[in-house]
Structure formats: structure tokens, C-alpha cells
Amino acid sequence: MRKIFFCLSLAFFILSCNNDTTKTTATSTDSTAQKSAVDLPYTASYTSNWSTDVSDADLKMVLTSYKDWADGNIANLSKSMGDSVSVDFNNGDHFNGKNADLMKIWSTYRDSLSSVAIDMEGWQKMYATDKKEGFVVTWYKETDTYKMGKVDSAYYHDINQVKNGKITWYSQYKRPAKK
């Protein structure tokens, strides 16, 4: 389901950048129930009803969490995360547990770095109107400098699910930068 959601969020981003408008017609009096005028080869298993109805405060909180990571401020980063958090790491590992346990994992990794530079290339607020769930998706390049001198750069695409002003699910996809 996470891969499907990733594909949907990427498709939504690409389509939202298009200046051409696609006409949709309402199939009922419910404003969230819309049918595409185009006969599509797939039906979304999660949802195809998206808006950008995520608060600017939630967007700022998510983007600030990246700044806190870059600055090594794990205490502030912790405040952005829910009490219970699910994380899908870019290496395929999964974490489902308490905020404090996640911060121990992230602190250990961040402590191995002397600096982190993030070039935030873009973001998109996404609200699943039928599921009533908000997300902030991000695209960025991160350059990590390890204390031993090694420098590693990669491009990332993250999905941050936001509930009650906190990140409760975080999924990360990584593509190494060419050397």
C-alpha cells in the first residue's frame, strides 16, 4: 500500500504542475465524490480524492523538522513527532513504536555526522478528503558529512502523515546522487 501511495502522490504532484485543467463531473451531491472524465486503466486502492487542505502550520512544522535534523536538534525534532510513530526507512526497515525510542535511533545516526545540508527542492500538501488524512510530501537533496570525513549525497522523497499537529507516519525513499 505504501508503494501505491507513493506512486499516487508522485502522480498527484506531476499532475498538479500541469496548466491544462481536467474537467470532472460530480456523480452525486457529495462534493468529494467525483468521477474523472477520462477512462483510467486503474482505480486507486487508497484514494483518488485529494485536496491541499492541510494547514500552513502543519506544513511549517514538517519543514521545521527537516531543519532540526540538519541542525542536529533532536530535542526539537522529537516535538514534531507524535507519541507513537510509524516509520518506513529507505532501506526497507520499519519502525512502529514510541517517539523516545525513535529519537534514540535517529540520535545515534545523527551523532555519526559532523554536518547535514538539505536543499529542499519542493513540497506538496495533500489531504485525502474521503479518508480525512493529511500529508506533506517533500523532495530534497541531502548531503551528509560523516565525522570520519566521508561525504554522501542522495535525493529523497518523503511522505509525512500529520495528525493533530504531529507527524505520526513517515516514509522515506532514496536515490543516491551521482558521484
Could you describe each region identified by the protein language model?
Residues 13-16:
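C-terminal motif of bacterial Sec signal peptides marking the signal peptidase cleavage site
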Residues 94, 143-153:
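Short, cysteine-centered beta-strand-loop-beta hairpins and adjacent loop/turn segments enriched
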